[in-house]
UniProtKB/Swiss-Prot annotation:
Name this polypeptide is given: ATP-dependent Clp protease ATP-binding subunit ClpX
PANTHER family cross-referenced by the UniProt entry: ATP-DEPENDENT CLP PROTEASE ATP-BINDING SUBUNIT CLPX-LIKE, MITOCHONDRIAL, ATP-DEPENDENT CLP PROTEASE ATP-BINDING SUBUNIT CLPX-LIKE, MITOCHONDRIAL-RELATED
Organism, as annotated: Exiguobacterium sibiricum (strain DSM 17290 / CCUG 55495 / CIP 109462 / JCM 13490 / 255-15)
Domain ClpX-type ZB, residue spans: 1-54
NCBIfam families in the cross-refs: clpX, PRK05342.1
Subunit description: Component of the ClpX-ClpP complex. Forms a hexameric ring that, in the presence of ATP, binds to fourteen ClpP subunits assembled into a disk-like structure with a central cavity, resembling the structure of eukaryotic proteasomes.
């Protein structure tokens, strides 16, 4: 109930008791009044409480063992990479909590470079890490970036994607994760500095240096090129975790040559020749990235190196079935919504893995293979209420025969043999 000064006939603030003459403004509510001073005080209390909640949330950074355990739920294999990423992520957010310093020691950022073939899980690892901490996440493609003043995207547009992922909450975006894919495509054409302008190679690496290390960047709110008369969003990149990744095709040869030099003169270098692709990539060093075409200053901003091995047939079969969001589980759930059961035989799963290896697409190509196989049956199922179960076999994958159907009356329709041209 609002207060009324009987002597002067003036309204009072229901919270602090000040009259309308003692404050700048009184806001009326149903039976109450509140002054501008009390409104300001309430705002401060709310902001302080929200700030405390956010601080508590960031301080509950999971330990490396916990991070790796969650990564295991979504990513098959790549144990060494998962361990490296878990430690880097833990150290990065521990550094944020310490304000970038521990006593008189300044703590450097733990930006990450991931080396691995297409479809080995680089993007999935980065996405899962962001999901673990519930921080904004953005993916950018390095091939679309060019130096300022040339046709293409400015590096600041990467930051805009992160700001958009944080619903334009800049403070939240400043603690997010950015994954830059295809980073190997901006390697300069040779190890020696070029006299001519390389607008999508060394020039982009130079442009990325500042935001990787930490700077206050000016980002155009609508993207595109900067114009002198537009307003900019200011974002501090000091606490943004940058992860870059690429296939780095051919880097294994550079590593082999380096390893080969160590055994020259000792008689037998057969050990070097017999190294597996996994062992070769695991031996990668910053100097190999420099030989590939990344400039030393750029490599220096990426202190954590994680190598991912090519996925073999067994790993691809596990990827199809084991993770929480495995593709086979997704398609089973999709058909379940039409009251139809879906089953992939063991040989069908192996065939899917073989096709992905043949196409050199790794895990990335698994979905398109299943989609091609399932297209006809997913087209038919909504119109056929008699189907109870669909069985996909290896012959279905190779295109020799259609899927086997179990009908609700108990009869079985074997997939028709397809004619070969």
């Amino acid at each position: 109930m609002f207060k009324f000064n009987e002597e002067k006939g003036q309204l009072k603030c229901s919270f602090c008791g000040k009259t309308q003459e003692q404050v700048r403004k009184l806001v009326a509510g149903p039976g109450v009044y509140i002054c501008d001073e009390c409104i300001e005080l309430c705002n401060e209390i709310v902001e302080e409480e929200l700030g405390t909640e956010e601080e508590v949330e960031l301080k509950n950074v999971p330990k490396p063992h916990e991070i790796r355990a969650t990564l295991n739920d979504y990513v098959i294999g790549q144990e060494k990479a998962k361990k490296s990423l878990s430690v880097a992520m833990y150290n990065h957010y521990k550094r944020i909590n310490a304000g970038g310093r521990a006593d008189d020691v300044e703590l450097s950022k733990s930006n990450i470079v991931m080396i691995g073939p297409t479809g080995s899980g680089k993007t999935l690892l980065a996405q899962t890490m962001a999901r673990i901490l519930n921080v904004p996440f953005a993916i950018a493609d390095a091939t679309s970036l060019t130096e300022a003043g040339y046709v293409g995207e400015d590096v600041e547009n990467i930051l805009l994607k992160l700001i958009q992922a944080a619903d334009y909450d800049v403070e939240k975006a400043e603690k997010g994760i950015i994954y830059i894919d295809e980073i190997d495509k901006i390697a300069r054409k040779s190890e020696n500095p070029s006299i001519t302008r390389d607008v999508s190679g060394e020039g982009v690496q130079q442009a990325l240096l500042k935001i990787l290390e930490g700077t206050v960047a000016s980002v155009p709110p609508q993207g595109g090129r900067k114009h002198p008369h537009q307003e900019f969003i200011q974002i501090d990149t000091t606490n943004i975790l940058f992860i870059v990744g690429g296939a780095f095709d051919g880097i294994d040869q550079s590593i082999k040559r380096r390893l080969g030099k160590k055994v020259i003169g000792f008689g037998n270098d057969s050990e070097n020749r017999n190294l597996t692709q996994k062992e070769i990539l695991a031996a990668a060093l910053p100097e190999d990235l420099q030989k590939f075409g990344l400039i030393p200053e750029f490599i220096g901003r990426l202190p954590v190196m994680a190598t991912l091995e090519p996925l073999d047939e067994e790993a691809l079969v596990q990827i199809l079935t084991k993770p929480k969001n495995a593709l086979v589980k997704q398609y089973k759930k999709m058909l379940q919504l039409d009251d139809v059961e879906l089953d992939f035989t063991e040989d069908a799963l192996v065939e899917i893995a073989k096709l992905a290896i043949e196409r050199k697409t790794g895990a990335r190509g698994l979905r398109s293979i299943i989609e091609e196989t399932m297209l006809d049956i997913m087209f038919e199922i909504p119109s056929r209420e008699d189907i109870a179960k669909v069985i996909i076999t290896a012959e279905t994958l190779t295109g020799k025969r259609g899927p086997t159907l179990e009908l609700k009356d108990g009869t079985i329709e074997h997939g028709k043999e397809k004619e070969t041209a």
